[in-house]
Amino acid sequence: MAVEFDLRQKSTRELNAALHRLNGSGDTGTWRIRNPHGLHTLAVGVDAPLTIDIEGHVGYYCAGMNKYARITIHGNAGPGVAENMMSGVVRVTGSASQYAGATAHGGLLVIEGDASSRCGISMKGVDIVVQGVVGHMSAFMAQSGRLVVCGNAGDALGDSLYEARVYVRGTVASLGADCVEKPMKDKHKQELEGLMNEAGITGADAAEFRRFGSARTLYNFNVDNADAY
Amino acid sequence: MPTDRKRRKSDRQNVAELRTRLRESASFPRQVIAEIQRAARTGIYDIRGFGAKRRIPTFDDLLFLGASMSRYPLEGYREKCATNVTLGTRYANNPIELKIPVTVAGMSFGALSAPAKEALGRGATIAGTSTTTGDGGMTPEEREHSKILVYQLLPSRYGMNPDDLRRADAIEVVVGQGAKPGGGGMLLGQKISARVAKMRDLPAGIDQRSACRHPDWTGPDDLKIKIQELREITEWEKPIYVKIGAARTYYDTALAVKAGADVVVLDGMQGGTAATQDVFIEHVGIPTMPALRQAVEALQELDMHRKVQLIVSGGIRTGADVAKALAMGADAVSIGVAALIALGDNAPELEDDYNEIGSSAGYYDDWHEGRDPTGISTQDDALAARFDPVLGGRRLANYLRVLTLETQTLARANGKSHVHSLEPEDLVALTIEAAAMAKVPLAGTDWIPGHAKF
């Protein structure tokens, strides 16, 4: 039996407090949250392997800093969905605004629609799979983890990125500083297939993707790179 | 034939004459010439630690009036002068209670060694005040040894996680710092050890340049929601500070209040840094004294003075600095460079070691190089092992107590039974610049430049 929570009757604070009471408990229950109506900071700081279904659009920072929970947003997500996620799975059935998965350290973020600019900015180990397109400056300063884009990528993809790996099936408007295309080896195809399986994305063949990563030329100060600074 | 003695005498005369005829350029003094030569040799800007070294108007340009016929002083040892501070009374369910009006500013593990961070926690805890993490996450050492620990949320989000958020006593959203308003963090490869790299999720040995803007909010409207998220994650328990570098301070303070800050932390241009371009340190931002006045004016205009608390930092060295900052309207001050000096930085006993790395006690500012002979600003295990965190903590506690005693001395002299009762009317300025910046009258006059009388 799912726990029903109606945000027309109770507040964001009451929702988060109720979820946090289960933090560290290992509870695997199911929660159905109705009428989110674009509210901000829903289901943030959850630390239990709950299954949470949010039935509608959400505002800023939904599922922020998530640990263990499987959170599905049945709608669109505002800025910073799953920001700084540590683990678990966050799925957006619609599209996501800016900075989706920003600085996230782990877990899996799936966006079934499109993601706006700065998707995966400063990502630190999270895996992000976007079925549609991503906007400009995606994977900016991305440190580690994988970003998979089934559609096209906007300008300055992977600017100043570190060790994150970026896979794009469509076109790339432009690459950011120090981001270069790298060969797709078998191990990368396997990694990509694994990620798409995990994300439940079908209809995209790993062979159609290109791989991008850091040229590592900006890792240490070098006068000869002054034009890139 | 001149004798040897005569020749030596005439050489000395020539040298002496030459010296008096040598004229150093005001525009191109030796330090400027040396910097041009260094730039031409290396092709890269100068990076260093410490804070601004140029001469600027400071709290030294202000004086307390004291008490006499028109005001009563308090007895030095018999009448109590309280120093406690409460931070976070606006929204936080668990405000911070400090025994003294001096806190320890954010300095990262990475910039500092683990035992140095531990010492900061030990010293602050003995003295009854808080210490702060930095751009690199929270170490178990500093959490264990800090009774009150402020956890910084920085643009890089290195090491940021919800467990440490919950473990923190307060959260500080860092928008900027006084040494470099508008600049991000910097940690050069020499200090990216395996442990630092792991905490920050970076490859070891790279020159880390942190982002200067937050990744998931832009502007005060977004920040308001970001702060709401932090409060939701931590059950509205913890005070949320917003730290700004002194720039357009009046507006920045007002916007921090609008964004929902419990506490505004204002860092003036003298504020320290572990590693920043010298040109940034010396040429961006405004001094602590005028910035403080602007921040207090913004709070007063919003009727938020003493409701949103104000912590000011940047060049605080003595109890006189503390008392003057409080008199101008701050609720507390914060120390960074002075705390490191209390731990042992720039110790004259280590002159030979400083000479070996091309510096000298009293001048050492190459904190970014990680070769600190005191073991404070390094990630070299052998150097760090030289530093005794227990002794360092004791020295910091001593220094914090001296600052507090000096502050009380000045407060009593002005007839105040709480350091927060100090007020701008207790101050005068020694220079026209300081009078204009602090908006207190030039000593012996009722003149505040730029202030028309009604």
Where are the predicted features?
Chain A
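Intrinsically disordered, low-complexity terminal regions
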Residues: M1-L42, D47-P49, V129-Q131, H136-M137, ...
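Beta-strand repeat architectures
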Residues: H20-T30, H40-L50, Y61-A69, G80-S87, ...
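Feature marks extracellular polysaccharide-active and adherence modules
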Residues: R34-P36, D53-H57, G64-M65, H74-N76, ...
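Short loop/beta submotifs within extracellular cysteine-rich repeat domains
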Residues: Y60-Y61, P79-G80, Q98-Y99, S117-C119, ...
